[in-house]
Each structure stands twice: as C-alpha cells, then as structure tokens.
Amino acid sequence: MESLPARLAQASPASVDGTWQRHVPAKFIAGALNGRSATGRWGTENGFPVLYLGRPTESVTVEAYRHLIDPVADAAPPISPRALITCTVSVSTILDLRSATNRILSNLTMQQLQSDTRDRDAYRACQNVAAVAHQLEFHGVIAPAATQMGETLVLFTDRLPASEEPARIAEKLWTELPPDPRNPGQGRRLRVVRQ
C-alpha cells in the first residue's frame, strides 16, 4: 500500500465558497478568525495553526454542546459568554473529505470523522491526515461535520494567501447556548457565570 502522502497527493484539490460560522469565548472575539495551534480533531498543540468553521448554524450549535456540555456531568455547567462569528469564505486547494474517493485515499472512515470528542484514536487519524495535507500545501480540509449535520471546514491559516482569508460579516453574543438541535423542545442550556 502506498504511503499516506503518496495517496493524498492523488486527491484533486477543491474550492470552497460561502458563509461559515464558529463559536468562541466572547473574550476572544477580536481574534476569532485567527488560526490556533491547539489539540483538536484536525490540529495539535505544537502543530500548525488551524481555524475551525462549520455550517449550518445548527451544526455549530451542536458542536458547542459536544465540547462544552456533553462531557460534563452537571446538568447546567457554568461557562463564560460565547460569540457566534459568521464569515464569508472563498478558498482553493482544499482536501475534500466529503468525497468517498478522498476518504479512501486518506484512509479515514465516516466513523472516525464523526467520532465522539473523547475518541483519541479517531482524533489521531484525522490529525495525521491534516498534517500530511498541510505538508502537501493544501489550504485546509472540508469534511462531513462530526455533528452528523452539515460540514466542517478547517483552514490552515499559515497556508492561506491574503486573498483567501475569511471575512467576518456578523457576530452574535451568546449569553446562553441556543436550544440543542439534537433535542428539540428540551430547553437544556448553559448558564453564564460573570467573572
């Protein structure tokens, strides 16, 4: 079997346009569209900077619940205020993992792409693909969202030319999370603790 770099070099780069969103702690609103080197599905603490975006809004909301609520036992854990950032994107040279062909080339399964936030093996597999894509000078990765609704766009901000940087078009303060789209009518929300 060919190496991962050799296989991913066969993937056809895609272009991605449209409106995307992300949630951030409100205190980081100014730098919300900057990439960060941090451990996540597509990045590592000591790696290259990544910027996570999602669509539709329901997917971004579920992602907030997956990371802030689902792993916590308290029915209403306290959080700081958050912000929903909306931006427009027009990027090229994206590894498109929505394509079954590219998922086969990357050796990633839908189960790995949509794994629980605590599945370290799935995260390592995705991080490895992102590292190779970055090495091959892709500008990012687009994949089915882990929320199982919508898409995730991960931009490698150190690879983006200035003309492809996301443009902020709106921001909305969340003093509590919107209702969880996975549980319509359930009303389970976060309460905000003022510091």
Residue ranges and their predicted role:
Residues 41-71:
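Extended catalytic/binding region for NAD+/ADP-ribose chemistry, centered on the ART fold
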Residues 1-35, 41-44, 71-195:
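Active-site and NAD+-binding cores of ADP-ribose-processing enzymes
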